[in-house]
Amino acid sequence: MSISGITNTALSGMRAQTMRIGAIANNVANSSTPDYARLNTSLTAAASGGVQATVSPTASDVDPATELTDLIEAEQANKANAVVFETGADMWEMLMSIKRD
């Protein structure tokens, strides 16, 4: 995989987790709204590499413990993707400095 492929994969992961965090925020904000359908985020492998997020309503009720657990998981995944992106960017900078020398 190329360095740009690494960074693009990490970026797609961060975008997907951002969508997931948005769905969680909606669930918590609307937990007491009558007839609110909880939003669920499904993550799948994208054809071009990386991750694709799909948000869809579900029939289940909002459970604060589940939302908190999902939020922690999404934050950790976002941090991991940020580290991968940073590593790819560092590798790119190193290659460019070698090329200049």
Where are these regions (language model features)?
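Amphipathic alpha-helical polymerization modules
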Residues: 1-101
